UniProtKB/Swiss-Prot annotation:
<keyword id="KW-0378">Hydrolase</keyword>
<dbReference type="Pfam" id="PF01979">
    <property type="entry name" value="Amidohydro_1"/>
</dbReference>
<feature type="binding site">
    <location>
        <position position="144"/>
    </location>
    <ligand>
        <name>4-imidazolone-5-propanoate</name>
    </ligand>
</feature>
<feature type="binding site">
    <location>
        <position position="177"/>
    </location>
    <ligand>
        <name>4-imidazolone-5-propanoate</name>
    </ligand>
</feature>
<feature type="binding site">
    <location>
        <position position="242"/>
    </location>
    <ligand>
        <name>Zn(2+)</name>
    </ligand>
</feature>
<keyword id="KW-0408">Iron</keyword>
<protein>
    <recommendedName>
        <fullName>Imidazolonepropionase</fullName>
        <ecNumber>3.5.2.7</ecNumber>
    </recommendedName>
</protein>
<dbReference type="InterPro" id="IPR006680">
    <property type="entry name" value="Amidohydro-rel"/>
</dbReference>
<keyword id="KW-0862">Zinc</keyword>
<dbReference type="InterPro" id="IPR032466">
    <property type="entry name" value="Metal_Hydrolase"/>
</dbReference>
<dbReference type="GO" id="GO:0019557">
    <property type="term" value="P:L-histidine catabolic process to glutamate and formate"/>
</dbReference>
<feature type="binding site">
    <location>
        <position position="321"/>
    </location>
    <ligand>
        <name>N-formimidoyl-L-glutamate</name>
    </ligand>
</feature>
<comment type="pathway">
    <text>Amino-acid degradation; L-histidine degradation into L-glutamate; N-formimidoyl-L-glutamate from L-histidine: step 3/3.</text>
</comment>
<dbReference type="GO" id="GO:0005737">
    <property type="term" value="C:cytoplasm"/>
</dbReference>
<comment type="similarity">
    <text>Belongs to the metallo-dependent hydrolases superfamily. HutI family.</text>
</comment>
<dbReference type="GO" id="GO:0008270">
    <property type="term" value="F:zinc ion binding"/>
</dbReference>
<feature type="binding site">
    <location>
        <position position="81"/>
    </location>
    <ligand>
        <name>4-imidazolone-5-propanoate</name>
    </ligand>
</feature>
Length: 405
């Protein structure tokens, strides 16, 4: 990204969907308003009649929203799982596929066998699909390397992707994603490697800003998850968790006990878990793509989340095994159709609540004075259009840190 200019730039004659909950109108809509941007941040929002003199860009009545935030992705990986999906449709069990070398282990193998340049080339078109939908910030997880050099490689590629494409990155260490082949039968030993070697080394190298764990019967136990959280906490690193996707293990309560940023998936979330998340300020990250692709039937408890006023983020969970959808608009649509969110809730889920899921709620996810000038400009009349019709992105331009992309 180019360096933000200190000159005041006036983005005038826009229809602003601020997503600011303090504004009375749905979506925080402000008709005929202008954004005043300086040093990569929003200096002020003023009515069109009050625009000062200075360098201006005429939006010609276009819709402006906060830049979209995809707060949960596995964008960097090698290989493909398309044939495995076809096998599953033909009745072959995941256990059979895994025993023959498929499943997550096939992605681990392909990722380990790929160079940084190869992983970058594979991830680039995936990222471009998200950028075409107005994404200005995204999270990318490791988790297909499962050893020090390959986890490092994945995180380095994530950083290069962001640097080359005008997008802000939140990198997450997900080394506790699965037990690698060389540690089969010794998950505790692998967690020791994560806690004592991978996590502190890559943290010292500045390659990530949060730590995630897959806490499930087919992943890691709550006890193993807590070991990773303790190692992260000792270094002052925020945590989050893949929890309650396939069963109820108390993962949401565990994430909440460590004041985690988000609890993700949460189809089997209990009321006790929801209450714990409310108390800790943990965001509920809904991932409808995985729910759809796995043909699940148990839905996240959206009504309970509303009752307890737990913020709901929405993300793609883009990954090769369970959610091969690089479309945040589609995730928003699925969240409405499958989980019962309103379009306005879905928009909050990819803006201000997604920002909170990344610990950036004070600077991202709204059009508001003092916030980073990340926004999307649309040839659209209303924000609902992007939720209603996924696959047709009316994006005009993205603006990242005040710079037109």
């Amino acid at each position: 990204m180019t360096e933000a200019t200190s000159e005041l730039v006036i983005w005038r004659n826009g229809r602003l969907a601020t997503l600011n909950p303090d504004h009375a109108q749905p979506y925080g809509l402000l008709e005929r308003h202008a954004l005043l941007v300086r040093d990569g941040r929003i200096a002020a929002i003023v009515a069109e009649d009050d625009v000062p003199s200075g360098r201006s860009i005429d939006l010609e009545g276009r819709l402006v929203t906060p830049g979209l935030i995809d707060c949960h992705t596995h964008l960097v990986f090698g290989g493909s799982r398309a044939q495995e999906w076809e096998q599953r449709l033909n009745g072959v069990s995941y256990q059979t596929i895994s025993a023959s070398g498929g499943g997550i282990n096939s992605t681990v193998r392909a990722t380990r066998d790929s160079s940084e340049a190869e992983l970058l080339a594979l991830a680039q078109p995936r990222l471009e699909r998200l950028l075409r939908e107005g994404v200005t910030t995204l999270e990318i997880k490791s988790g297909y390397g499962l050893d020090l050099p390959n986890e490092r490689k994945m995180l380095r590629v994530a950083r290069q992707l962001a640097d080359h494409n005008g997008v802000e990155l939140s990198a997450t260490l997900l080394s506790a994603h699965a037990t690698p082949p060389e540690y089969q039968g010794d998950a505790d030993g692998y967690i020791t490697l994560v806690c004592e070697t991978i996590l502190p080394t890559l943290w010292q190298e500045g390659l990530f800003e949060s730590v995630d764990v897959f806490c499930e019967n087919v992943g890691f136990s709550p006890q193993q998850t807590e070991r990773v959280f303790q190692a992260a906490q000792a270094l002052g690193i925020p945590v989050k968790g893949h929890v309650e996707q396939l069963s109820s293990l108390g993962g949401a309560q565990l994430v909440s006990r460590y004041h985690g940023l988000s609890a993700d998936h949460i189809e089997y979330l209990t009321e006790e878990g929801v209450a714990a998340m409310r108390e800790s300020g943990t965001v509920a990250a809904l991932l409808p793509g995985a729910f759809y692709f796995l043909n699940e039937t148990r839905k996240p408890p959206v009504e309970l989340l509303r009752k307890y006023q737990v913020p709901m983020a929405v993300a793609t969970d883009f990954n090769p095994g369970t959610s091969p959808f690089a479309s945040l608009h589609l995730a928003m649509n699925m969240a409405c159709v499958k989980f019962g969110l309103t379009p306005e809730e879905a928009w909050a889920g990819v803006t201000r609540h997604a920002a909170r899921a990344l610990g950036r709620q004070a600077s991202h996810g709204q059009l508001a004075p003092g916030f980073v000038a990340n926004f999307a400009i649309w040839d659209a009349e209303h924000p609902v259009e992007m939720v209603y019709e996924p696959g047709r992105s009316p994006l005009w331009h993205r603006v990242v840190q005040g710079e037109l992309q």
